[in-house]
From Swiss-Prot:
Cofactors named for this entry: Zn(2+)
Function field: Binds the 23S rRNA.
Residue numbers binding Zn(2+): C16, C18, C37, C40
Co-factor binding details: Binds 1 zinc ion per subunit.
Family per record: Belongs to the bacterial ribosomal protein bL31 family. Type A subfamily.
Protein name: Large ribosomal subunit protein bL31
Molecular function via GO: metal ion binding; rRNA binding; structural constituent of ribosome
One biological process term in Gene Ontology: translation
Species name: Haemophilus influenzae (strain 86-028NP)
InterPro entries linked to this entry: Ribosomal_bL28/bL31-like_sf (IPR034704), Ribosomal_bL31 (IPR002150), Ribosomal_bL31_A (IPR027491), Ribosomal_bL31_sf (IPR042105)
Gene Ontology, cellular component aspect: ribonucleoprotein complex; ribosome
Pfam families from the UniProt entry: Ribosomal_L31 (PF01197)
PROSITE patterns linked: RIBOSOMAL_L31
Keyword tRNA-binding: no
Gene: rpmE
Length: 70
């Protein structure tokens, strides 16, 4: 590797809004604030909801004559 052309790789702390603190390394060089992390994201916590907004699936199926699977 060439000397002097690579950015410094520093230890940073990523803090989530839920209070979870993650220590990692980054070239950013300053602490990071996160909105969501693996501890509070709905997909990982199992609290994810599938929202059918305004019957769009039924509208699509009726438009293309796809029989309902229910």
């Amino acid at each position: 590797m060439k000397q002097g052309i690579h950015p410094e790789y520093k230890e940073v702390t990523a803090t989530c809004s839920c209070g979870n603190v993650i220590k990692t390394r980054s070239t950013l060089g300053k602490d990071i604030n996160l909105d969501v992390c693996g501890n509070c994201h709905p997909f990982y916590t199992g609290k994810q909801r599938v929202v059918d907004t305004g019957g769009r699936v039924e509208r699509f199926n009726s438009r293309f004559k796809i029989p309902s699977t229910k």
